[in-house]
Amino acid sequence: MDTIAITVDCSADDFEQVAAFWSAALGYERVLPSYLIDPAGVRPRLAFEIVPEPKVVKNRWHVDLYVENLDELEPRVRELVDLGAVVLHHLDEVTQGFTNVFTTLIDPGGNEFCVCAPH
């Protein structure tokens, strides 16, 4: 089986803050300054790479963090904000018979991600 690592591009100015944020947010171990692993060895690894160009548009893809139930959504969002994330918006809608409840945030490097409740 292949090992999956997700690489996050960062500026030199926010590299440390972004890596520290995701380590704390996911409970990952920081094995190198630019590399995080899941202590259980189950979830994808995260790598951080310093790039010279600034982020100028919305991500073409993003990470969704799922909580176990709707009651956990708001506390999880507060926890991530305390770690340095910023809330962009919250959505609670019914689409094609499914209830979508999620909050979109950005990490300290400006990368979008969502905290979602199961539908």
Q: How should each PLM-predicted stretch be described?
A:
Residues 1-19, 61, 116-119:
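N-terminal beta-strand motif that seeds the catalytic metal site of vicinal oxygen chelate
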Residues 2, 57-59, 97:
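Residue-level preference for beta-strand/loop junctions
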Residues 4, 43, 50, 79-81:
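Macromolecular interaction modules
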Residues 8-9, 34-39, 74-78:
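N-terminal start-of-chain detector that recognizes signal peptides
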Residues 15, 63-109:
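Vicinal oxygen chelate
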Residues 22, 46-47, 90, 102, ...:
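Bulky hydrophobic/aromatic packing residues
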Residues 26-61, 67, 108, 112-117:
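Conserved short beta-strand elements that form part of the metal-binding/catalytic scaffold
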